[in-house]
């Protein structure tokens, strides 16, 4: 059926309907057009078409949209009213009184519309109880152009479990036993004490103190090495004397630390008690000079 006949047939059945075309996109030289039929604000049919001339694409989309309504079948079922019945119906209705000259001039036009053939007279539009479902006809070219691109789902990224935080086992350094031991020290013992300064920051490790077998020591050496004044003792002098003995024996800081750990379970002379400090000085004075 020609395009003009389809449009006139559409206007005959749906005088209040609208037929519009929208250009969706241009793909590889083809104009993709969508035709929509709207009735009382509701889209009742739509169709797509893809052609190289824009006019051809619009005509094809309109033809498909009108054909989806099946107007030829509806027109065959609706009985045709004769012009005589229409004229009689119009004559039965009272004509409105003329209110102005302008309305009188329009009355001939209204009479002329009454005597027009039924093809032009607009019958009462047949509104379906439920608007038909929009039928969209898609050509292979349109489906290829409108096909959505596949979405890529990124693979989940797994992270290794974070390691447990390492807790520091460092214990606070206890204050030195004697505060006066850091003052009033002779100037000549300062470089020796800095060389043999022991590490106080490292935590104390529980080491098993091996009990040394009691070895007989000469009483003469003990009595001669531990001669200290009977009055109040200056522990800075004891530390200075132990520094001189360590330098005489050629001991390193590691050797002194190992001896303190094995004998007293402590890493520094600052942690020794008064008796242990005097005992350590006596032990150093008993050692012969290395040759």
Curated annotation (Swiss-Prot):
Protein name (database record)? Uncharacterized protein slr1353
* Source organism superkingdom: Bacteria
- Indicate, by first and last residue, each region the UniProt record lists as having compositional bias (Pro residues): 125-134
Organism lineage: Bacteria, Bacillati, Cyanobacteriota, Cyanophyceae, Synechococcales
Location of region: Disordered: 77-140
